[in-house]
Amino acid sequence: MSFSTFLNAKKKEVELPDFEGALIADTHAHLDMLEDPARALARSGLAHLGLVVTVASVHENARTICDSLEGWRQSARAMLDAAGFVDIEVPEVRVIVGGHPQDASKMTDEGRALIREVARNKRVVGIGETGLDYFYETSPRAVQKAQFAEELALADELDIVACLHIRDAHDDALEVLRSTGMPRAGAILHCYNMGPETLAPFLELGCMVSFAGPLTFRKAHDVREAAALVPHERLLTETDCPFMAPEPCRGQTNEPAYTAFTAGMLAEATGLSLRECAEVTYSNARKLFGCDK
C-alpha cells in the first residue's frame, strides 16, 4: 500500500477533508513513538499540515529530540520527491519539553536543569506536557502539584507556552493554575475530552483548548458541545499520536496526518467551514508558538 493512501478502521481507503488549500496544525504529537517519524511527516504533508509540535520527555528523549528533527524532515522530503509529490511541503516541526505528571516522582535537580537547557533551543516552543494525572496515580498528588507549579513558573520565566495534561484532576489543576498564575505566553488545555461545565473555568483563565481524536468519537456529544463554546481565537487541533486515532481511523496507530479528521469534526461542531476552521486553528497555533518571530 502506498504511503500516500489513507485507510479507515476497516482498512478501506478514505478521503481526507478538503480544506481548499488551507493548512492545519498538529499541536501535540509524540513523533519519537512512531515506527517511522519521517514517513509520518511525509504523510502529514499530503494531509495539508504546515506545523507539527512534538513532545520531548526529560526522562526519555529531551537531549536528542531537537537534533533528530532535521533528519526526519530531510527523509520525509526524499520520500515525497521519490513518490512524485515534489510540490508538497514537509511541515515545520517544533518541540515542547518537560516532565509528564505521571513521572513526577522521577524528577531530579538534573532533570530540572535539563528542561531549562533544552527549552532555550530555538525549536522549543513550550513546557510540557505538565499538569496532574490522577487516573494512574503513579506519582503522589502532592509531588505532581509541586512539579506542575514549577513548570508553570518556568514557562512564565522563559515566556513560552505551558501544555497542560489534566486527567481526573481538573479541580486541583485549577487550584494550581490560580495560585501559581498563568504563564505570560499562555497555556493549552491539551486533548480536551470533557463537557462544557468542566471547560468553563479554564476558559475564564484564558486557556487555549486543543481537540484531538475524542472529539470525533460517536458518543462524544459533550465534547462537541464544549468545542462549540470555545472562542474561535482559542481553538487548536492535535493528534496526541500515536494514541487515540480519530474516526474513521479509530483503533489504528494515530499519526499527525489524522489531524485532518479532527479538524473536519471541529468545523462541524463550531459551525465553521472546513477552510475557515483550518485557517483559524493554524493561525492560532503559529501565533501561540511564535513560529513567525
Question: Which functions belong to the PLM regions below?
Answer:
Residues 1-293:
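Mid-domain alpha/beta scaffold segments of enzyme catalytic cores
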